[in-house]
């Protein structure tokens, strides 16, 4: 209830609101280049940014990219109706895995364009096993998927409203290299040597990385695995 009262206080009577939703910080990085480009092309429009997780909200609640930043209330019929009626967005963009069915239904019902961006689908997901879940995707105006496999999966259940646009995190990373944040500890560790940094790695990534490290001992490496329990194992394998 606090979210709704706080939201109403700032968006009431506002116009041209475009709503972006990210689950967490990683999804925000995927959405960031899209928001930046949108603001550049539509300077009079206002950006509402919502998060599901505290990690995303707490770090980005004061971002200059958005006019307002909020948590997204739970995906219930009443919450979806209330939120959308309050915000009255002219278009909505959800990043990657985010499919909130009640919100999607209400957006479709009110003829508000809804875009799923940097989307990635995999075999075994409920959308490709059960008709009810596949039906929910009909509420998406257009999918911008990361890869050909995702496009093939959508096509296999009768969808053609998709574009293969890649992973927008690459756009974000390229932009970050033009204005890098200096980290003293990393600079000290690098000692003017080429340093390769790998973040949120998975087991399959690490198999390739370990072989690469063994073949290129002249470099320094910083690896932050997704599973923290794997740190000691990586240290042993890489002689780190």
Explain the meaning of each model-derived region.
Residues 152-153, 184, 208:
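Short, solvent-exposed alpha-helical surface patches in well-structured domains
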Residues 34-41, 207-218, 237:
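Short hydrophobic signal-anchor/transmembrane segments that target glycosyltransferases
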Residues 2-6, 11-179, 197, 201-203, ...:
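Active-site and donor-binding regions of nucleotide-sugar-utilizing enzymes
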Residues 223-240:
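Catalytic donor nucleotide-activated moiety binding site of glycosyltransferases and closely related
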